């Protein structure tokens, strides 16, 4: 996996985590 793809994946996980916290 490339560094760019990894950071992109990390960003996606962060977005999901934030939206999950917002729901609660």
UniProtKB/Swiss-Prot annotation:
The keyword Secreted applies. Expressed in mature brain, thyroid gland and testis. Keywords: Cytoplasm, Secreted. It holds the Pfam family Humanin. Coiled coil: none annotated. Plays a role as a neuroprotective and antiapoptotic factor. This is Humanin-like 10. It comes from Homo sapiens. The gene is MTRNR2L10.
């Amino acid at each position: 996996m490339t560094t760019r793809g990894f950071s992109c994946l990390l960003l996606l996980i962060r977005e999901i985590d934030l939206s999950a916290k917002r729901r609660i």
